[in-house]
Amino acid sequence: MIHSVLIFNNDGLPRLMKFYTKVDIPTQKLLLQQVHSLISTRSAQECSFITPPSLLEDLDDIKVIYRHYATLYFVFIVDDQESELGILDLIQVFVECLDKCFSNVCELDLVFGWQVLQTVLEEIVQGGMVIDTNINRIVAAVDEANSQKNVNSNGSTISASILSSLSRDRGFWGR
């Protein structure tokens, strides 16, 4: 299971912090600081898998897997059921999707286009489980969600891809 996805810059400023397990905010901040301090001192030739920071030391089955792209670190905190190489590939898929959505993504795109960043991640991972890794399908779903937002009765937005999948099912909704 994926417990957390972190994206932060070289200075340790978070650009995305998504937790799939319950973690209080002070612990999230401390975890970000500890992970940044461990990763930022490593060279590009070193392995992309690190031992967990002291905050996670008591958990035997936790792994920290990361990739460094330009000024950003993409970090996944996972349990031992996940493949390290599979997560590295997943990070690559995530970055390639962002690159297609933003036309050569940079840190400012993630700051000002945080909705797209969240949508891309939600198309790939939900509830800590990987649901899709097909770049073309993910980008198409994000494009559809961005171009056709529908407003429900509460005024919140529901993406068209979710609505279309519900209408295709027609099991409950067709009554």
Swiss-Prot record:
It comes from the Eukaryota. GO terms for cellular component: AP-3 adaptor complex; cytoplasmic vesicle membrane; Golgi apparatus; intracellular membrane-bounded organelle. Coiled coil: none annotated. Pfam families: Clat_adaptor_s (PF01217). Disulfide bonds: none annotated. It is a peripheral membrane protein. Keywords: Cytoplasmic vesicle, Golgi apparatus, Membrane, Protein transport, Transport, Virulence. GO terms for biological process: Golgi to vacuole transport; protein targeting to vacuole; vesicle-mediated transport. It is found in: Golgi apparatus; Cytoplasmic vesicle membrane. The keyword Transport applies. Part of the AP-3 complex, an adapter-related complex which is not clathrin-associated. The complex is associated with the Golgi region as well as more peripheral structures. It facilitates the budding of vesicles from the Golgi membrane. Involved in vacuolar trafficking and contributes to hyphal growth and pathogenesis. Adaptor protein complex 3 (AP-3) is a heterotetramer composed of 2 large adaptins, a medium adaptin and a small adaptin. PANTHER family: ADAPTOR COMPLEXES SMALL SUBUNIT FAMILY. Belongs to the adaptor complexes small subunit family. This is Clathrin-associated protein AP-3 complex component APS3. It comes from Candida albicans (strain SC5314 / ATCC MYA-2876) (Yeast). The gene is APS3.
